[in-house]
Amino acid sequence: LAELAPALQALVTRLGRTPWLKSRLKGIGILPSDATGLSGPVARADGNAGDAWGRLWQRLDEITTSLDFIKAIGEPELPVLRNIGHGSGTGEASVETPRGQAQLSLTLEHGQVKSYKLDTACRHHIGLVAQLVEGRELGDALVSVGSLDLSPWEVIS
């Protein structure tokens, strides 16, 4: 993954030198001041004008930082899956994903998943769409929604 750093830096430089892109994204998709439940880059970009331009640069900064970490300490080892046998019980886990926090709760009965609940940032961010698009031109509405980086797979889960 660390080999991607030069290409990413070239992209960041190119985007920074594109005034048309900045003028198109700046001031578009500003989040409502009463927005709650934000997480991930959408929340962290809120202190950066909270618009589509700020969210783009927040994501680029986070990708750059992640590649810097990988370069400094190496790629992470993937966990080894183990056989849990026929165990039963409940569990919860939270993890920071590229789109924000995800929380998983599940129940096992005799080694089989009986119920689960997956709560992702996209499920919270989808609630912003109506506020971001109301009264906007179509192009601005599309930019606003696109800047939220919604995953259709997470929204419908």
Across the structure, where does each feature detected by a protein language model lie?
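Active-site bordering "gate/hinge" segments
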Residues: 1-157
